[in-house]
Amino acid sequence: MIDSLHGEVLHVGLNYVVIECSGVGYRATASPSLLGTLRKGEDARILVTMNVRDDGIDLYAFESDEARQMFAMLRKVSGVGPTSAMAICSIFKPDEFARIITDEDDAELRNVKGIGKRTAERIIVDLKSKVAVFDSGDSASEPQSGVGGNSEAEVDSGVVGTVTQALVELGFPEKQAEKTATSAAAEGGSVSEILKRALRSMSSERN
């Protein structure tokens, strides 16, 4: 069982990273917020979990052990595959996820592409008694970076690119994804917050 990877970052892709460990390059699917912290040529240590399939083994990387635990919980829910589980982990931090489940907010879960009402309700039912371990007890939202927002000209292009890539990976058209990511980033916040804001905007446009 591979628990973590430590080595040089060889490549940071759309939704994955390649890290060289003892001469072997390991590719792991990762969230936009984690990918945003990794730089090619730098040394990094990431936590991973393995998903064994009939035709191979996939690695998924996480920023924290709590996020990895959350992924494992989601994978135990019927109908939630690794792609959907990773999409949820990419958008919600563990404490945010705990509040969503506790509040039975299936609408928030349905903002994640591929999660319908029935699956969202099943996630809530199956995990409601298990997510207390993630609840920090702080009901306040995360501090916003760039309070008061920024003009679109001042928006960090790297953040916009990361969020755009995440939206494209989730199945949204690139042009629409970039426009929405730029607008969402103008309000400030972390990559995770901006991604959630963009998803809400794109979901409302579809309705």
UniProtKB/Swiss-Prot annotation:
Gene3D superfamilies assigned: 5' to 3' exonuclease, C-terminal subdomain, DNA helicase RuvA subunit, C-terminal domain, Nucleic acid-binding proteins
Any one Gene Ontology BP term: DNA repair
Lyase as UniProt keyword: no
Keyword DNA repair: yes
Species of origin: Corynebacterium kroppenstedtii (strain DSM 44385 / JCM 11950 / CIP 105744 / CCUG 35717)
UniProt protein name: Holliday junction branch migration complex subunit RuvA
Region named Flexible linker: 143-154
Main location: cytoplasm
Region described as Domain I: spans on this chain: 1-63
Compartments, as annotated in UniProt: Cytoplasm
Coiled coil, from the record: none
SMART domains in alphabetical order: HhH1 (SM00278)
One GO CC term on file: cytoplasm
Annotated keywords: Cytoplasm, DNA damage, DNA recombination, DNA repair, DNA-binding
Region (Domain III): 155-207
